[in-house]
Amino acid sequence: MSCCGGNCGCGSGCQCGNGCGGCKMFPDFGSDEKITTTHTLVLGFAPAKGSVEGFEMVAGAAENDCKCGSNCSCTDCRCDPCNC
């Protein structure tokens, strides 16, 4: 689910990162949960995209950004369905 084009995962962990997938994009891991890491090897190439398309995507993301504020709260959040 993607409701927010900015850089904030609005959860109790207040984790900020790139490519917001919506509120609580980053899971809140408890002390008894195990975190695993996987590696992916990509074999092959895709045709290059036009630079105009990439620019539009970046410009669109800048319009709807959420920022992590004090006390793990969201400020300047304009992702309507998300209500961070």
Swiss-Prot record:
Annotated GO MF terms: metal ion binding
UniProtKB keywords: Cytoplasm, Metal-binding, Metal-thiolate cluster, Nucleus
User: What does the record say about induction?
Assistant: Up-regulated by cadmium treatment.
Where is the protein found, in the record's own terms? Answer: Cytoplasm; Nucleus
Q: Which cysteines are joined by disulfide bonds?
A: none
- Please provide, in alphabetical order, the Gene Ontology terms of the cellular component aspect for this entry: cytoplasm; nucleus
Tree of life domain? Eukaryota
The question of whether Nuclease is a record keyword is answered with no
Key word Nucleus present: yes
Q: Name one Pfam family in it.
A: Metallothio_2
Q: Which InterPro entries match?
A: Metalthion_15p
Identify the tissues in which this protein is expressed: Expressed in leaves, stems and roots.
Q: What's this protein's family per the entry?
A: Belongs to the metallothionein superfamily. Type 15 family.
Q: What does this protein do?
A: Metallothioneins have a high content of cysteine residues that bind various heavy metals. Probably involved in maintaining homeostasis of essential transition metals and detoxification of toxic metals. Increases cadmium and zinc tolerance when expressed in heterologous systems. Metal chelator binding 6 cadmium or 5 zinc atoms per protein.
Free-text comment on this protein's domains from its UniProt entry: The N-terminal (1-23) and C-terminal (66-84) Cys-rich domains are both involved in zinc binding.
PANTHER family, sorted: METALLOTHIONEIN-LIKE PROTEIN 2A, METALLOTHIONEIN-LIKE PROTEIN 2B
Q: What is this protein called?
A: Metallothionein type 2b
The species is Colocasia esculenta
Task: Show the taxonomic lineage.
Answer: Eukaryota, Viridiplantae, Streptophyta, Embryophyta, Tracheophyta
